[in-house]
């Protein structure tokens, strides 16, 4: 069938293609059938919607379709039934618990990227992996397929270093300090980061307070070849595009299969050509990984997968039992990170973690002798070399290199929670702190978040400030206050827990 494109001012949440009932009957197209639109070398798959919203001879497309391929009103295109994708039988194979071959995994990933598979089929694939798992051979094949169906970055400056934290700990602005330290030592580190999904700030959200993070692959290549580093948002790039489509389904199902998590992280590293990768696994109560046993098991998987991909991987299991530094939220974290870079000093939890991780990367890349990386990383930070490199990164990405911490606007609607008793801080609930910061507006409102006044082990008196909530609107602040009072994320106890009387 050939017809004229009609752009419809609607969003459906999927790739909807609207067909007049007469055309649908003539071409034997049924509701929700997979159909293909072609125009020259451009093509897209979508679900058929039958209705009189379009006239006979018209093919209606939603805004969702336009977000992937640009078609113009009145453009002549061809439309045809697509049939059942070949990959569906491979998904059924995994549902039966059978091992998938490399070519079968490649077919599934290609069909996901081409949008031949809808959310129902992708959900079945994700669920099959959750139930039956993937072995390391399958994970490696999936990783490579995810990377090679997207764009690949070719950087000539070697060696190429990379770092990734699996997250789960609020206030983790560590990589904003690690990256300039590593680059200042002469190594290459093109860091792509995510925005917050369930946290109060992703690395990209924090860096965006200081400079532009939405760059093209060509711009990244130019910057990295020139200064050895970047701090950009990976979501603006076509890196491992199947990953985003699968993550969308995982979130809806509240699933996070280990095999997919490993492939998701390593596919993006493979796509940008990372040779030496440090994985940070924060571990502790309230973190994504709560036990050392689970952390060690995950570490072994990362190392084994790296070997299969030709990448050298080391894993740092770090303390994740409370927030890193004293701030949570994009602007608050950017301010704290910039202060640390400018002065070479900062909260112990932030500085020690940053130089510890940076030191490992220096040793991995040959910029420091074994066992001396942390010392050299500290020196680079304290002598201002990391700050100078951060200025270069900010400027090359389109920001003002002269930005100062006091230039960063923070939410001016504030409320401070105080201690109700004397004692010691025995625990800070990571999930509670994150929930309150998000209720205050983070990460969408850059100035929203939480400033902690105490950490675990601190002695407090009744009336002492525990944390301050920052928001950009009174309504957001009020909601955050209600949640803070309900959750009580900071626990205070006396040294004497109970007295047993001699009766």
UniProtKB/Swiss-Prot annotation:
The keyword Electron transport does not apply. AMP binds at residues 168, 194-199, 203, 264, 288. Disulfide bonds: none annotated. InterPro entries: AMP_phosphorylase, Asp_de-COase-like_dom_sf, Glycosyl_Trfase_fam3, Glycosyl_Trfase_fam3_N_dom, Glycosyl_Trfase_fam3_N_dom_sf, Nuc_phospho_transferase, PYNP-like_C_sf, PYNP_C. Keywords: Glycosyltransferase, Transferase. Pfam families: Glycos_trans_3N, Glycos_transf_3, PYNP_C. The keyword Transcription does not apply. Its EC number is 2.4.2.57. GO terms for cellular component: cytosol. GO terms for biological process: AMP catabolic process; pyrimidine deoxyribonucleoside metabolic process; pyrimidine nucleobase metabolic process. The active site is at 256 (proton donor). GO terms for molecular function: 1,4-alpha-oligoglucan phosphorylase activity; AMP binding; pentosyltransferase activity. It catalyses: AMP + phosphate = alpha-D-ribose 1,5-bisphosphate + adenine; CMP + phosphate = cytosine + alpha-D-ribose 1,5-bisphosphate; UMP + phosphate = alpha-D-ribose 1,5-bisphosphate + uracil. It is an enzyme of class 2 (transferase). Catalyzes the conversion of AMP and phosphate to adenine and ribose 1,5-bisphosphate (R15P). Exhibits phosphorylase activity toward CMP and UMP in addition to AMP. Functions in an archaeal AMP degradation pathway, together with R15P isomerase and RubisCO. PANTHER family: THYMIDINE PHOSPHORYLASE. Belongs to the thymidine/pyrimidine-nucleoside phosphorylase family. Type 2 subfamily. This is AMP phosphorylase. It comes from Pyrococcus furiosus (strain ATCC 43587 / DSM 3638 / JCM 8422 / Vc1). The lineage of its organism: Archaea, Methanobacteriati, Methanobacteriota, Thermococci, Thermococcales.
